[in-house]
Amino acid sequence: MNTSYDAVVAGAGVWGCTIARRLAETGRKVLVLEKRKAIGGNCRCRTIDGIEVHLYGSHIFHTSDEEVWKFVNRFCSFNDYRHQVLARYKDRIYHLPIGCTLLKEFFGRDLKPSELDDADRNALFDAFIRGYTSKQWGVPPEKVDPSIIARLKVRDTFSTDYFDDPHQGIPLEGYNELFRRLLDHPNITVRCGRGYRLTAEKLDCPVYYSGPIDQLFDYRFGELPWRSLRFETEHVARRDFQGATVVNYTEVSVPFTRIHEFRHYHPEAKGAFAKPKGTIVTREYPSDWKKGDEPYYPIATPESAALLAKYQEEVARFNAGSPHPLILGGRLGAYKYYDMDKSFAAALAVPLV
């Protein structure tokens, strides 16, 4: 397929939109292909009754990377939202992350995590980690990759801020506007409802691909394992449902992992998100991924690492025989569990060709 473009970007999420903008600002003509009907990837939102509803679960921007912070602020301003997460266990509410506040609430005495004995640590693990992790990943926590458990935050302070990063917030005009502005450039053409298949079309320009790497090669070596999510969203006819943006339900007997209440992401309540009518809540249900589902979290195992290596070798073979390189990235293309700022950073670091 001949094109009049200097590059094609497949996927209009964080990584793809950032790549497209960088290419456009160097003077290249860029075609962005997005298989969904709208841009924004899993940050896509919809305004319902004056509330910015995150369609694919809560997305909070936070970073300590000054380059990333400077880049995103070219396209939007952020509010001063600081993320806090509550946990519900046996009909009581606790403040995450694990720190002095939660220990005081759970044990009824002043403690630091470093002062816990084995019995206390086991009780804490069973209450707040075991059930939630089992639901999220579909296996006991002992079988989860250690890097996942390492993401859990532990503090020797009373702070209940979930993130430590100095820069945090939600775009004042919403995530959709951030992505619209990223792609608002005369050198960028966007086609939604249009994916990219390597085996179906050959392009005479570089391709930057952020879809699933196994799908790119028609699952030649088999499917990489993912966890998927299902969301149930409802309007509740009262001003506040749970008093927080996110409440984790840590017991395995509760089928969902958490409830999101999106009105709390805009405490400034001005502009498009002023005076919401009632509130919107979403329950999040993890599930095993199968073809046709949305892939969310890569499952890191020795087997998946070996399978990923086979697909990466296919990319290398393709590039060795093609004058137009294929560059993969993003959560799906790299098969990595990225925070949003890390996906921006990865896209900013890609050498452009």
Tell where the protein language model's regions lie, with residue ranges:
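Short loop/edge segments at beta-strand edges and connector loops
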Residues: G11, R82, V190-R194
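Dinucleotide-binding Rossmann-like beta1-alpha1 core, especially the glycine-rich loop
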Residues: D49-L116
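Glycine-rich FAD pyrophosphate-binding loop
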Residues: A24-D49
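N-terminal Rossmann-like FAD-binding beta1-loop-alpha1 element of flavoenzymes
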Residues: Y5-V32, P351
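Active-site/ligand-binding neighborhood in enzyme catalytic cores
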Residues: A87-P206, S210-F217
